[in-house]
Structure formats: structure tokens, C-alpha cells
């Protein structure tokens, strides 16, 4: 887990309760290079955004960053995840408030290595967010 927030203590307690300490590493502030290294070695990127105190994840650049490495994402329906994830192809969109749905999506992608197929698609899908392609889209509009 990279980051911190009000739920950090609860998440750490849950990891301990489930005896998963050897499978989690909690990091707070890390460099961009370190973050990219962790993402590139992952099988799946999970950030089930929710509306919290009238605030929500905007575009979801983190999903694009993961896709650049061929890592599929699971994002919450609230916020900008659906702008960066093609549901059912480059990742999954779920209700970030529904733990069963989040688990089900994680399980689905990790079962039978489905994440590999999703990751390949994510790596090609993310090219639409490259500046040269965005500029071409603006030219069409103008």
C-alpha cells in the first residue's frame, strides 16, 4: 500500500488480523521512481475511489500510470476511474463502497491469470492518453 489517510490504522489492523503482514508493505511518501518500480512489478492496481466529504478522485492519472506498465486496474465508479479504465477490458469498475464487489473483481482478474490479458489491453488502450494523440483530438474539435 502506498499512501496514507484516515483509514491507515484500520487497514493495518485488518492486515494483522488476517495474518497477511508478510504480503503487505506500507509506504507513505516515496519518490516517483520508487512508485513506478512498485507499479511495474505488480499484477494489479486497485484504487476503489469513493466520494468522501464531497471529494472524489478526478481523472485518475494513477490508473493511466499503471496501464503504461501493462498493469490492469480496479477503480471505483465514483470519480474519474471510468475515464481511464475500459471496464471489462483494461480493468474493472466497481462500487468502491462494496467490499464484496471489490473482492469479486480482484478474484476474477487474478483467477486463471486473467490479469495478463487485461494488462495487454491496458497497455495499448492507454496510448489514447499520450499527448500527441490528445493534440490530434483537439485538432479535430477545432
Q: Where does each model-flagged region fall?
A:
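Short alpha-helical donor nucleotide-sugar binding micro-motif in glycosyltransferases
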Residues: 29-30, 37-42, 138
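Acidic donor-binding loop of glycosyltransferase active sites
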Residues: 40-55, 71
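Nucleotide-sugar-dependent
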Residues: 50-64, 82-83
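Nucleotide-activated donor-binding/catalytic signature segment of Leloir-type glycosyltransferases, i.e.
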Residues: 12-34
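Short hydrophobic beta-strand element within catalytic cores of glycosyltransferases
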Residues: 63, 68, 72-75, 85
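Conserved acidic donor-binding segment of nucleotide-sugar-dependent glycosyltransferases
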Residues: 86-88, 92-99, 108-113
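Glycosyltransferase donor-sugar binding loop
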Residues: 1-11
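A short, well-ordered alpha-helix in the C-terminal region of glycosyltransferases
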Residues: 23, 101, 108, 114-128, ...
Amino acid at each position: 500500500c502506498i499512501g496514507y489517510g484516515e483509514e491507515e490504522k484500520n487497514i493495518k489492523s485488518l492486515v494483522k488480523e488476517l495474518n497477511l503482514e508478510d504480503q503487505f508493505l506500507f509506504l507513505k511518501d516515496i519518490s516517483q521512481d520508487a512508485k513506478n518500480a512498485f507499479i511495474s512489478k505488480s499484477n494489479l492496481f486497485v484504487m476503489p475511489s469513493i466520494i468522501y466529504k464531497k471529494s472524489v478522485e478526478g481523472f485518475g492519472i494513477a490508473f493511466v500510470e499503471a496501464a503504461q506498465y501493462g498493469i490492469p486496474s480496479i477503480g471505483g465508479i465514483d470519480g474519474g476511474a471510468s475515464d481511464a479504465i475500459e471496464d471489462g477490458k483494461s480493468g474493472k469498475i466497481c462500487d468502491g463502497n462494496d467490499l464484496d464487489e471489490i473482492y469479486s473483481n480482484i478474484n476474477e482478474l487474478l483467477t486463471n491469470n486473467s490479469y495478463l490479458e487485461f494488462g495487454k489491453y491496458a497497455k495499448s488502450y492507454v496510448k489514447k492518453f499520450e499527448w500527441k494523440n490528445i493534440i490530434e483530438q483537439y485538432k479535430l474539435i477545432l
